[in-house]
Design a protein with these regions (language model features):
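Ligand-binding pockets and gating/stacking loops
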Residues: 1-208
Length: 208
């Protein structure tokens, strides 16, 4: 109960996260009642959990599946997410918590750089699922910030430079958590197996 009681937070902190802010009109598919304020509150609660020693916090933001109405949907979700996510990172840093907290913002795949206009959907163009190039941002927790790693082709269809496989990403996370991913290897039927598979490598360029 104490954790979710925000009465001890200053007005400036609540405003920084956007707690109490109004939803945008003409909601996207992720719309509902008070979703902007609710997501802001969730980000603030994440900081409060970290302060109290919670080891893993998952903030879920839904409805980025923009197969149609891209302009409206993307503006709605980005406006909902940008302020409180930035506030969370700033707040963690101001309180001396960011160096020991790894912040990861990502999803399971990206979106196509070219438009999608499939039958049965709105006539307004959207984007389809795209596993061949997408980005994740990371902050704090041993990350060397202020850099962009990797590059796509000219249209954003394929990653072509400094590509990071998901196994490399997992190996890097484990390293940041203090685990040597190669020590998690086991042998079965003549082959080595591990969480990061045998090709996964730590992305040292990411690490401070």
């Amino acid at each position: 109960p104490e954790l979710i009681d925000l009465r001890d937070e200053t007005r400036s902190t609540l405003d920084m996260y956007g707690v109490g802010r109004k939803d945008l009109p003409n909601a996207g598919r992720g719309g509902g009642k008070n979703v902007f304020s609710n997501f802001s509150t969730n980000c603030l609660l994440a900081r409060r959990m970290v302060e109290r020693g919670v080891r893993f916090v998952n903030i879920y933001h839904a409805s980025w599946d923009h197969h149609s109405n891209l302009e409206k949907e993307l503006r709605y979700n980005a406006t909902m997410a940008d302020q409180p996510v930035a506030a969370l990172i700033k707040d963690l840093k101001q309180r001396g918590l960011l160096d020991d907290t790894l912040v990861v913002w990502g999803s399971e795949f990206g979106r196509t750089p070219l438009g999608e206009n499939r039958g049965g959907r709105s006539a307004n163009t959207g984007r389809d699922h795209h596993p061949f190039s997408f980005s994740i941002f990371m902050a704090g927790g041993g990350i060397r910030g202020g850099q962009v790693i990797g590059e796509t082709d000219e249209v954003g269809w394929h990653a072509i430079k400094e590509r990071m496989h998901i196994n490399d990403f997992h190996a890097t996370l484990l390293h940041l958590f203090g685990f040597d991913h190669e020590r998690l290897t086991y042998r079965f039927k003549g082959r080595d197996f591990r969480l990061t598979d045998v090709a996964g490598k730590v992305a040292n360029k990411l690490i401070s």
